[in-house]
């Protein structure tokens, strides 16, 4: 089968369009003929040599796939050959065929295209898990979402509008993305390059602060994030693009009863991910099937041009997701 392999760690030029052996499903696994996968920030970090896959997972890049079941391993009961599915995988998505655990896979309605489906698992599950399950965001509260225009942020905005329609949504974004972020349903869009988002949050909320923050920047934003949190607010930390070390005023955090929760999806235990996916499928997949929530595809590339897709990701001008299309689909 065709797949993207790495000649070495480094830039996009290390990605090669190669022929490798098609995997065989083991117990509890399904083999998916992949129609589409998407590019995620962890793929870039793994390509650079800084984010190895969990033990036992494929070293091929790609954390989510959409396609059709080709075959099933022993013990699989839900899916059979020919079923449309979308799956969260620990690796192996940048290939014509990918293995997925059956309980990490979800049924894919005919109303959802494979290109859209390829955008679901990594970003929508991440947004839903951290905002609603861990962050405990409730209706009529306030939320600050960083990185407007990125896959997780656009997913988070849509989920807030669908699941907590009375929630006030604040989003940070670059100048060129402000109008498009607003069109997704954000009530307030803050130009982080021109404004202090902490000052803007205090102004917008009349100095109260927000109840939940979804942040992938980390150290660079920590002080401003804590200043932006309301009493008993929660900072959901899902990335460290802006650094891993920062000072924290613990006294203020204690007095204001604030929480910081660090969270990643990929390294969670298999059974825990299966539970999260089952809850997500019940809560969110019907909304996507109905068109209430719509994955945003900014650009598509043939699998052979994965290096160009990574270059686009690293330049940061995309809005929504970048999708790779498999050959002969």
Segments the model singles out, each with a brief description of its role:
Residues 118-194:
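Mid-domain Rossmann-like dinucleotide-binding core that forms the NAD(H)/NADP(H) cofactor-binding site
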Residues 78, 84-148:
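NAD(P)H dinucleotide-binding glycine-rich loop of Rossmann-like/cofactor-binding domains
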Residues 176, 182, 220-292, 325-329:
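Glycine-rich phosphate-binding loop and adjacent beta-alpha segment
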Residues 290-299, 307-329:
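C-terminal capping/lid region of NAD(P)-dependent oxidoreductase domains
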Residues 197-207:
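Short amphipathic alpha-helix with an adjacent loop that forms part of the alpha/beta core around
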Residues 148, 217, 240:
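NAD(P)H cofactor-binding loop motif with strongest signal on the N-terminal glycine-rich segment
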Residues 21-38, 50-92:
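Glycine-rich beta-strand-centered segment in the early N-terminal region that forms part
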Residues 84, 142, 168, 234, ...:
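Short glycine-centered segments of the SAM/dcSAM-binding site in methyltransferase folds
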């Amino acid at each position: 089968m065709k797949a993207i392999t790495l000649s070495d760690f480094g830039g996009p030029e290390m990605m090669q369009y190669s022929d490798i052996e098609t995997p065989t499903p083991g117990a509890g696994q399904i083999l998916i003929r992949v129609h589409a996968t998407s590019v995620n920030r962890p793929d870039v970090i793994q390509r650079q040599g800084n984010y190895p896959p969990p033990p036992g997972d494929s070293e091929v890049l790609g954390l989510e796939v959409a396609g059709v079941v080709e075959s099933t391993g022993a013990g699989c009961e839900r899916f059979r050959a020919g079923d449309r599915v979308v799956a969260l995988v620990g690796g192996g998505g940048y290939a014509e065929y990918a293995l997925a655990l059956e309980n990490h896979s979800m049924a894919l309605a005919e109303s959802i295209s494979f290109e859209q489906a390829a955008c679901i698992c990594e970003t929508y599950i991440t947004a839903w898990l951290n905002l609603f399950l861990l962050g405990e965001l409730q209706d009529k509260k306030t939320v600050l979402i960083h990185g407007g225009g990125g896959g997780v942020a656009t997913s988070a905005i849509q989920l807030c509008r669908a699941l907590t329609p009375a929630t006030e949504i604040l989003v940070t974004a670059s100048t060129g993305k402000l109008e498009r972020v607003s069109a997704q349903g954000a009530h307030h869009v803050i130009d982080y390059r021109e404004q202090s988002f902490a000052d803007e949050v205090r102004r917008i909320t009349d100095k109260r602060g927000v109840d939940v923050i979804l942040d992938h920047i980390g150290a660079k934003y920590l002080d401003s994030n804590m200043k932006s949190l309301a009493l008993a607010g929660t900072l959901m930390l899902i990335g460290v693009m802006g650094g891993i070390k920062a000072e924290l005023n613990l006294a203020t955090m204690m007095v204001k009863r604030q929480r910081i929760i660090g969270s990643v999806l990929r390294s969670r235990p298999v059974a825990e991910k299966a539970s999260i996916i089952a809850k997500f499928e019940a809560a969110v997949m019907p909304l996507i099937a109905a068109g209430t929530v719509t994955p945003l595809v900014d650009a598509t590339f043939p699998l052979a041009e994965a290096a160009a897709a990574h270059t686009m990701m690293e330049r940061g001008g995309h809005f929504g997701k970048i999708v790779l299309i498999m050959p002969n689909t």
